[in-house]
Amino acid sequence: MNSREIIFERFIAPLKKKRCNYIGIEIEMPLVNLNGKTDKAVCTDAFARATERFGFMPRKFDDDGVCHEAVCDDTGDVFSFDCSYNNFEISLGRVRTLHEAQARFRDYVGFINNILSKNNHTLTGLGVNPNYKINDYNFVPSPRYRMLEGYLKKCRIWNGPFHPFFGFGTFSSASQVQLDVTEDDLCETIEAFSLVEPLKAVLFANSYLPEKPELLCARDYFWERSPHGINPKNVGFFEPLPKTVGEVTDYLSKASIFCTERGGKYLFFYPIPFDEYLGLDTVGGEYYDGEYHACSFAPEAEDIAYLRTYKQIDLTSRGTLEFRSACTQPLGEAMTVAAFHLGLKGQTKELIALLKNSFLYRESGSPAQIRQKMNRADRLSTVDEEKLKALLTDVLSLCRDGLRERGYSEEIYLSPLFERAKTLSSPSRRLLRQNDIKKIVREYACL
């Protein structure tokens, strides 16, 4: 098979299967020591106790024998440390309603924070760990994370407009949602959610970075200005927006692969567009075995399993779209991100019509350009506030209609977003107004 056929089988063929409209939710949370640097022993102890309390089975261990991933066979829920022992992730197994997700999430976080509080630590709802300057920058010492660390550190060597935070994954946290999608709905869904991305920046910004004070959400900056962003097709938006499944296939065939496995070892290399990669005889890369070693290998069609993009909206190999751009939210409002996407998923035609006819797209540019503007701390000096409030309220009302049609009373999770729309506020803006990080950490940790 050629690269296009391989892409089709990996990403498009799963869309043809019958969909059950499940919801997938992943929430990363910074582990914060209110007294200073995070204590790894405190974090791993809380992880171990939660694993035992909820009947999870240890699944992955680091090079020192410390468990960094555990799974519940009954629910499919996963506890893990994401990139570092400062970043805890709860990946909820497939659920049919947000109430199921909320109940399990609250149980897990409530138990873990009760343990952490005894050592003045907490999980909190921030997109950037406030102690990132003093915390341990080391990645989890495991094969996959050793590979990722080596790759991201290449920002020090390769040419590019890279930021200096190669370890951004160790201190940045996101709230990600996966929803089933069909082949027929794929392009329309990508278009609708691409158009609404600028408004998500207004509602969900929660990753303030003092080194970039002009940004309320540093997520785009972290990903796009890292080695992941060498090929624009691996990050950001689908540009131009695809109109057919064939265009999606062509687009993904030009996304870059940067890692694979050989002989049980992860290899990484300078990113290569997949359609070019398969035509190469050999590729030079590196692997970790006590230290990083140079190597060369021959590309194989099976390496498609390692092709991964980090876009605002990603098409996965499981027949889902993953929405990646939202920062972790205050934990008492954790379901707002999933509720927003779930409610709009069945309203894509209406959403497209609403946004295309709005002042936002009549007066401005592409979704990417408008999101950049909406991400700025000085945004309100360049945008008509009343028009923006009205548009946000219209989009949220459409979302509420979509949730009501589901019939599970899930629209209750939108209440914080309606409040944010009224004031054009976000968790980042609240943080800046408060100017008391310990108070914000405690407030955003409350369930």
Predicted regions and their residues:
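Acidic, His- and aromatic-enriched active-site or binding-groove loops in soluble protein domains
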Residues: P141-F166
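Hydrophobic alpha-helical hairpins/lids featuring a short glycine-rich hinge
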Residues: F105-N119
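The substrate-binding groove and active-site-proximal loops of carbohydrate-active enzymes
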Residues: S91-Q102, Q178-D180
